[in-house]
Amino acid sequence: MAAGKEIRGKIKSVENTKKITKAMEMVSVSKMRKAQERMRAARPYSEKIRNIAANLGKANPEYTHAFMKKNEAKAIGFIIVTSDKGLCGGLNTNLLRAVTGKLREAQSAGIAIESVAIGSKGLGFLNRIGARVVAHVTHLGDTPHLDKLIGPVKTLLDAYAEGKLSAVYLCYTKFINTIKQEPLVEQLLPLAADSLQVEAGQHSWDYIYEPDAQSVIDELLVRYVESLVYQAVAENMASEHSARMVAMKAATDNAGNVINELKLVYNKTRQAGITKELSEIVSGAAAAAGV
């Protein structure tokens, strides 16, 4: 019964793996809910900043911020948001495939590329392809803080404000629902004019700003862009935990199927062994009776 013992060992091994994937699935469910709450909580902040900036811009049409001007530089920037860990299905692979297409377009046009990596997977990818990484941040944990993101992101924002970049793209995975996540490569800078328009029917106001409206707009637009990056990180984190939950559930289900198949093979092997032993006993008894 050496074969039977080997099969029992395989069953035990797969059962242990199933326990691990089930535990990871449950942990991902909890983290996913918290990440979704953070993602939803971040939206009103950036929307309120956008509304204030839009009203200020309407009241001061003569002023245009550097983030809204188009530059003629032959260089673009990428902020790539990925996870720090794996085991989340094709989440990072799908995003990096979309990023690769955009990078190739830029390279074929002779445009220089500067990148900021948020997350270990994106940093590893950029290092492997030999991309120029001007800043990075990893190991944000389950509760990302804006102060950790500001430094690396500011590198590209300052470069754009100085006219060194013609565009900055934000690459992340947008959370649609628990089952679906969508990889996006969106233009962050220059800010689209329609993104800072006062919505139809929205009440506008004319406050007095100190020290002056221009200073407030300068500060608000920087905060607005930073909030968009934070929102992307929150969306990506919710997508990560959702994808990991789905992947671990699939792994748990597959482990269950493998266990059932191994048990079937074990029972067949055991039955064959018993049948063989009975045949030998019957043959031996018949031979003894014949003697």
Curated annotation (Swiss-Prot):
GO terms for molecular function: ATP binding; proton-transporting ATP synthase activity, rotational mechanism. It is found in: Cell inner membrane. Signal peptide: none annotated. InterPro entries: ATP_synth_F1_ATPase_gsu, ATP_synth_F1_gsu, ATP_synth_F1_gsu_CS. One of its GO terms (cellular component) is proton-transporting ATP synthase complex. Its main location: membrane. CDD domains: F1-ATPase_gamma (cd12151). Keywords: ATP synthesis, Cell inner membrane, Cell membrane, CF(1), Hydrogen ion transport, Ion transport, Membrane, Transport. It is a peripheral membrane protein. One of its GO terms (biological process) is proton motive force-driven plasma membrane ATP synthesis. PANTHER family: ATP SYNTHASE GAMMA CHAIN (PTHR11693), ATP SYNTHASE SUBUNIT GAMMA, MITOCHONDRIAL (PTHR11693:SF22). Produces ATP from ADP in the presence of a proton gradient across the membrane. The gamma chain is believed to be important in regulating ATPase activity and the flow of protons through the CF(0) complex. HAMAP family: ATP_synth_gamma_bact. F-type ATPases have 2 components, CF(1) - the catalytic core - and CF(0) - the membrane proton channel. CF(1) has five subunits: alpha(3), beta(3), gamma(1), delta(1), epsilon(1). CF(0) has three main subunits: a, b and c. Belongs to the ATPase gamma chain family. This is ATP synthase gamma chain.
